[in-house]
Amino acid sequence: MFAKRFKTSLLPLFAGFLLLFHLVLAGPAAASAETANKSNELTAPSIKSGTILHAWNWSFNTLKHNMKDIHDAGYTAIQTSPINQVKEGNQGDKSMSNWYWLYQPTSYQIGNRYLGTEQEFKEMCAAAEEYGIKVIVDAVINHTTSDYAAISNEVKSIPNWTHGNTQIKNWSDRWDVTQNSLLGLYDWNTQNTQVQSYLKRFLDRALNDGADGFRFDAAKHIELPDDGSYGSQFWPNITNTSAEFQYGEILQDSASRDAAYANYMDVTASNYGHSIRSALKNRNLGVSNISHYASDVSADKLVTWVESHDTYANDDEESTWMSDDDIRLGWAVIASRSGSTPLFFSRPEGGGNGVRFPGKSQIGDRGSALFEDQAITAVNRFHNVMAGQPEELSNPNGNNQIFMNQRGSHGVVLANAGSSSVSINTATKLPDGRYDNKAGAGSFQVNDGKLTGTINARSVAVLYPDDIAKAPHVFLENYKTGVTHSFNDQLTITLRADANTTKAVYQINNGPETAFKDGDQFTIGKGDPFGKTYTIMLKGTNSDGVTRTEKYSFVKRDPASAKTIGYQNPNHWSQVNAYIYKHDGSRVIELTGSWPGKPMTKNADGIYTLTLPADTDTTNAKVIFNNGSAQVPGQNQPGFDYVLNGLYNDSGLSGSLPH
């Protein structure tokens, strides 16, 4: 949402709210291993597993003419600004400072003065499809414009269409937040089924025109089905479309109910963005502060960013201070990681370093060239080719200005937040050899498990063998290798194969090979006894005959069996406790008693373990490891997701406990 120009008594509260510290994924991707278009290893198999370019204020024609550059920069999807009819404020002036009018709908016909016509939208979507790029539309369906006279008759003809424009007063009150008006904008009566049908027709039309998904603006201001007497079926209805990817803008606070919204869509990790910006400002990339996503929602349902259009363009200018170097470093952190879907915000030409709107461009123009910068592009490509690989975050030699993310044995990203170059000499799983930095100048060497080289000041290094980018890539969606995943009844798994893969097969427990295409699914566990294990092997082959294999492990566990987790204690604490808890609405249930939880037991292999009673309900539980004072994750951050039989280090889940 936005705060620009609304000089009301509520604005300071709303601006402060934006600064608080505190999916429906409908079907698999359409592309298969046999798909023939201009997509290649630069584009991930699905929106969820790729990166998104937020083409803020770019017109449809601008997007169409830059689609090849977007593709070559490694993005899997673009996110548009709102595409429907909006109020043309300030005589329709297209100066960047007038961006907020795009968030004041007057009707839900597609096309507006700022971005272009519906036909131009269709042509842009067709160009995106040619390059294997997916299109996400920013859908403003919580409210209309604040100018009642400007609202179209087709909206006003819907009986009882609005809650009115009485402004929100208590931002901790769910009823107030969802049933009253954001900044005086007329609030849709989202309980009204005629309103739901009207808005859904707009979404369906956008999909028919070529869109692939949606960002739902101000999503937390629309009630959920279980929001008491004012709850509605709005979200179950609205998200029941053919969209591949849908996520909601859920700016986190005490009333945001992030995890509940995640039952219907992916959600934004706004607190994590604040953690990243704080780390950049302090030039401290300590993994204890930036490893956790600061959300009770699992990483695979999060959209992450270094900054958003709100943090950049609102009057409080929360992130406008950042330089291009800051954004490169932040992007190296969030987009090198597994799990979440990173969103890159395209600033206006010349923006940043404290200047929001330098006047070098207007609404409709392309943003700054940073979106296709060498380092940004290298990290995007790294993100794509590392899909399915585990992550290991660290600060080499204890230097908190150096961030390192090692993705299995396939690749490494380094970021140096400091003002001086730093010599790297650290353990790695990369194969021996020389690695040229794909993000900039310099090269690194690996010998006998040691990575050595120099990373320049305020820079990024992206390292992986050249053949990985062209290699076939097959993986199981949302599951890691090197970890034994548990389930209780039966489990349906989605298979993925990238555009390099011309042939893909899987095996279960050394059984017959079964061919698959990207997005195919299979089920394990039905009717099988508890304790049965499953080894799933994937093999992909490219057009040159190069093959790659991946191995995954699963076990069907009795939900009544003992629940054990382990911690590797990399900090060598003399006392290790596990504090395990979960949320029931606003109530915290402490599964290991009050802080600091229960002591863990050191085993002969040096791993600390804790076993909970078999009847403990650990659904959606979190765990924090601590020694009574220091803790992992860091203070004021939610715990790691509790995974039965999981083995943890300071970056989170690292594997499974030995049998």
Curated annotation (Swiss-Prot):
The record marks 310 as: Transition state stabilizer. It is found in: Secreted. Keywords: Calcium, Carbohydrate metabolism, Glycosidase, Hydrolase, Metal-binding, Secreted, Signal. Its EC number is 3.2.1.1. Residues 28-41 form a propeptide. Transmembrane segments: none annotated. SMART domains: Aamy, Aamy_C. GO terms for cellular component: extracellular region. InterPro entries: A-amylase/branching_C, A-amylase_C, Alpha_amylase, CBM26, Glyco_hydro_13_cat_dom, Glyco_hydro_b, Glycoside_hydrolase_SF, Ig-like_fold. The keyword Transcription does not apply. It holds the Pfam family Alpha-amylase_C. Ca(2+) 1 binds at residues 142, 178, 187, 221. Binds 2 calcium ions per subunit. Belongs to the glycosyl hydrolase 13 family. This is Alpha-amylase. It comes from Bacillus subtilis (strain 168). The lineage of its organism: Bacteria, Bacillati, Bacillota, Bacilli, Bacillales. The gene is amyE.
